Amino acid sequence: MMVGSSSEKKIPLYDEQNDYINEDHISEFAKALVWQDYDDVSTTAPTTPLNGPLDMGDLSLLGGELGNGSDDVVVGDDDDDDDDDDDDDDDDDDDKTKYSSPQLKAAQEINDEATEIGAVPATTKPDLISSKNDWFPINSENLNPNSKRTKFAKSSKSSKSKSTSPIRALQNEFRNSASFTLLRWPILTFVVIWVTILGFLYLAVRVYVALLEYFFTWTGERKRLRDKLRQSTTYKEWIENAKELDKYLGLDKWATNPKFSYYDSQTVQLTINKLKKARLNNSMPELLILLQGCLKRNFAGIENRQLYSHMYYGTKNLVQDYYKEVVICINKVIESNEINSETKYKFFKTVLQNFGKSALCLSGGACFAYTHFGIAKALLDQDLLPNIISGTSGGGLIAALLCTRTNEELKKLLVPQLARKITACEDPWYVWIPRLLKTGARFDSVAWARKSNFFTKGSTTFEEAMAMTGRKLNISTVPADPHSPVILCNDITSPHCIIWSTLLASSAVPGILNPVVLMMKNPVNGAVVPFSLGSKWRDGSLRTDIPIDALNTYYHVNFTIVSQVNPHISLFFFAPKGTVGRPVSMSKRKTAKEKFASFRGGFIATALEQLFRLEIKKWLQIVKSLDLLPHVLQQDWSNVWLQNFTGTITIWPRNRLIDFWYILSDPNEKQMEEIITKGERSMYPKILFIKNRLSIEKAIEKGRKTSTAELRETQMNVALASDDDEDYVPSDYSLAKFKDRIGVTSKDFDMLGSTLRDDDADADVDEDDNEDEDEEDEDENDYEEYDVEDLDDPYESDAFDPHIVLTKERRHTVY
């Protein structure tokens, strides 16, 4: 009865019955892992234990039917064949008696033929010379001394003694001096001791500030109102509670005074007055010029975080008036019939480039990353989810879900029942501990590939995801080689790359998951093949957790919303001057005197906190610059602390001490409900800032789309690119204008054309030349140019009226 009643209460999850797993794609991924490891004879990565013989029951995992892999043989060592002929004959007899089905017998015959030529057939796991295991060094001494692999290594040791791995060579180039050898470890020991002392001092300052606020600041009615604010269940309820707390503390008076040192209030007020005057007078030329001047990132400092850090909800009234007036004026331009469609198009394209775009960046952080579900839900409920989303490690899983589902689907999926699809850590200890000891990783790559397919909607590529939802997904990964550059996988750098393979690579933390091969769909035939020549990739958070620079390069992003849940970074979040939606607590006595600025914990405590934190960072930077830290597991771990982990807006969800116990465990539905709620409440204080920014961004995007549609209607013969980076303005070129410019009459032009036709008829062109010309024509079509003619509008500003040639360029991709 108990089981039946619980099953009846089970709430179904949208699309729960679909796992979207393509077994063929998983099989190709598994084969790529195996064969890539075998081919890496001179790899710079550590090695794995030897693979055992392949069980015939597992062949579906490595390539499907037996006959399909019969030609995939790897040449072995010829020297060992003669010595082991008798043993091979005995093994063959045993194998023939073991495999009786026709397919297995055919596979055995292939094995016999391969043995005669000194090769290892594809139906047997190869003895890996080296692979991407994170725990054991190259040519590990832990190998079995009686194995063929060890004998081969010893026999070839003399011939390879002079060769070293690229990583070791790079290290030796900078570590070969006598002074470095002599002073490295003493300096490193001193730094470790000194940083440890600084860490204890930093902890003491933080404890002092926390106790001061707990016992002296947040007491009585103030504490009751703050607790009420923290327990808000909806954003509307949160706004009401925040306004009540602001009124009690007297912070609402701060919003009425337009003067503030962190932005130019006079410029903002003057801009509002001029925009309103031009709009009311219906002076469209002046309105266009004014809008182009103010539609820029952080105009007059209105995007300064301090404007939102002095109240729990709200900012300066003047700032709110500015955003409202600008949006009204943009809509006025969109609806105006006095401006032709081409002028509108050029105007909105220009201001969109000046204003920039917004992006949501989700950090890594193991199971803490599930807090991003609540962050995304809060943005989705307010229709504020950006179209550009990046994710790293655990954050990549949430980013993939957001970019492969529509808004309607996400509203059905971002619920506690989603926990039933999160099974990455379901293996018990007696399963993953042997795997960790054997492979150097707690989790299995192929198993994770299957489990991630639901979140990526199967083997969806970056290009396909953008076509489905209009969102641009970005996953940060780094090569297994620590000296290779980071790649941000997206629809530009890797449009055909399969998303779930990048998720595995972005989660490949040493000891958790071994580096994996990225997979892609061949754009010609759709076959799944390794990406980037089969190189292996690992967790991007090791070097680039928040790829702000790359997002700016690819998508012109200059406003980032960062959800930061990395536990080793959250510990150092202090906000001495307050942060968005969380002002520094101060007494009512100060606010009554209209003194709204104060350092958290006082000036001395803030100064000490800054001193100790920056001192720790300085010594870590010295260690990295001098290359003093050993590269444990072939990784420079100093990058984990020295990255840029923040954005324009950074959300720091609160973590309890008990949460660290579940850092590598799957949440149940109750825990998932708490996690989503925690993420939503962390997002509420930031929504107003984001809403103001996106109100202008959405209005500009609306104008761009509207003007593009109008231009298509008026000039149907010109194809406009739908992508932001490939938009171009059509030309008003005509044959009559061309004749007037070159000074010829229609009769002269016809004579010139007749002469050219006669020359073409007499020309003797080879077939090879024709083919070359056809190929050149195709290339020219890909780079077709469109001239922009002057519209002779009296009000058009020079900034968006250039005589330029816009080129539709081919995207550079790596297949």
Swiss-Prot record:
Q: Which GO terms describe its biological process?
A: lipid catabolic process; triglyceride metabolic process
Q: Which residues form the active site?
A: S393 (nucleophile), D539 (proton acceptor)
Question: InterPro entries given for it?
Answer: Acyl_Trfase/lysoPLipase, NTE, PNPLA_dom, Triacylglycerol_lipase_N
Q: Where is the composition biased (Low complexity)?
A: 54-73
Q: Which residues cross the membrane?
A: 185-205
Under the heading Pfam families, the entry gives: DUF3336 (PF11815), Patatin (PF01734)
What are the boundaries of the region Disordered? Answer: 41-105, 140-166, 753-815
Where does the UniProt annotation locate this protein? Membrane
SUPFAM superfamilies, alphabetically?
A: FabD/lysophospholipase-like
Which intervals carry biased composition (Basic residues)? 148-160
Give the EC number: 3.1.1.-
Provide GO CC annotations from the record. Answer: membrane
UniProt short sequence motif GXSXG, positions renumbered to this chain: 391-395
Query: What is the membrane topology noted in the UniProt record heading this document?
Result: Single-pass membrane protein
Annotated GO molecular function terms are: triacylglycerol lipase activity
Question: What is the predominant subcellular site recorded for this chain?
Answer: membrane
Task: State the protein's name.
Answer: Patatin-like phospholipase domain-containing protein LELG_00944
What is the native source organism of this protein? Lodderomyces elongisporus (strain ATCC 11503 / CBS 2605 / JCM 1781 / NBRC 1676 / NRRL YB-4239)
Q: What is the lineage of its organism?
A: Eukaryota, Fungi, Dikarya, Ascomycota, Saccharomycotina
